[in-house]
């Protein structure tokens, strides 16, 4: 099957069902990262992933990794860290710094090049992309970012500069997102780290149905306002890898 070359003058995408099996999920190449195209992609269960300086690659893998917010696993070590931490968590207060931190952590292997950073900062300014920040006093030490689709949040990347910072960001966000009406977090492709946190694979067709349903659901009006988030203590600990 041939891969579709996107036209810069059209925002259309092929059906995700046309994506390759090898490499898993590759659907189209080219186009650009203008906000309208990115939003069209996320609405169809498609996301960009490519190395800086290369053609833009668009993906919709099968299966798809997802995380139910209330099913996030908390390890014994993280549970202890939550009891002792002095870190504080905020929402939508330093988006550009968070995405830069995600790029920095991956160094030579990053896919978060300047064009990706610029594009997602534009989405943030338009109210579609959001960040969670972890602070040690006034220093940014961790965080995550992603794109909202109604009651579904498409997680893109996270980073830590101190132990457990990104996990605390995710735990705090999951609690907040669930309270605001959030239903599901898209983790894209399952790996050992996301699996240890409770993510699991579902068939792409099922993910696309979830996406369709979630896109029409609205969250509490204050969900994405810049604010401080709490770090609630989990009621019970689920033992996972340290």
From Swiss-Prot:
Q: Fetch the InterPro entries from UniProt.
A: Acyl_CoA_acyltransferase (IPR016181), Leu/Phe-tRNA_Trfase (IPR004616), Leu/Phe-tRNA_Trfase_C (IPR042203), Leu/Phe-tRNA_Trfase_N (IPR042221)
Task: Give the matching Gene3D superfamilies.
Answer: Leucyl/phenylalanyl-tRNA-protein transferase, C-terminal domain, Leucyl/phenylalanyl-tRNA-protein transferase, N-terminal domain
Could you list the residue ranges that cross the membrane? Answer: none
GO CC entries = cytoplasm
Q: Where in the cell is it found?
A: Cytoplasm
Catalytic activity line of the entry: N-terminal L-lysyl-[protein] + L-leucyl-tRNA(Leu) = N-terminal L-leucyl-L-lysyl-[protein] + tRNA(Leu) + H(+); N-terminal L-arginyl-[protein] + L-leucyl-tRNA(Leu) = N-terminal L-leucyl-L-arginyl-[protein] + tRNA(Leu) + H(+); L-phenylalanyl-tRNA(Phe) + an N-terminal L-alpha-aminoacyl-[protein] = an N-terminal L-phenylalanyl-L-alpha-aminoacyl-[protein] + tRNA(Phe)
Pfam family, any one: Leu_Phe_trans
SUPFAM superfamilies reported for this sequence: Acyl-CoA N-acyltransferases (Nat)
The alphabetized UniProt keywords are: Acyltransferase, Cytoplasm, Transferase
Give the Enzyme Commission number: 2.3.2.6
Name the principal localization, coarsely classed. Answer: cytoplasm
**What enzyme category does the UniProt record give?**
transferase
Single GO MF descriptor: leucyl-tRNA--protein transferase activity
One Gene Ontology term of the biological-process aspect is: protein catabolic process
Q: Which family does it belong to?
A: Belongs to the L/F-transferase family.
Please describe what this protein does: Functions in the N-end rule pathway of protein degradation where it conjugates Leu, Phe and, less efficiently, Met from aminoacyl-tRNAs to the N-termini of proteins containing an N-terminal arginine or lysine.
**What is the protein named?**
Leucyl/phenylalanyl-tRNA--protein transferase
Where does this protein come from, organism-wise?
Edwardsiella ictaluri (strain 93-146)
Question: Which gene is this protein's source?
Answer: aat
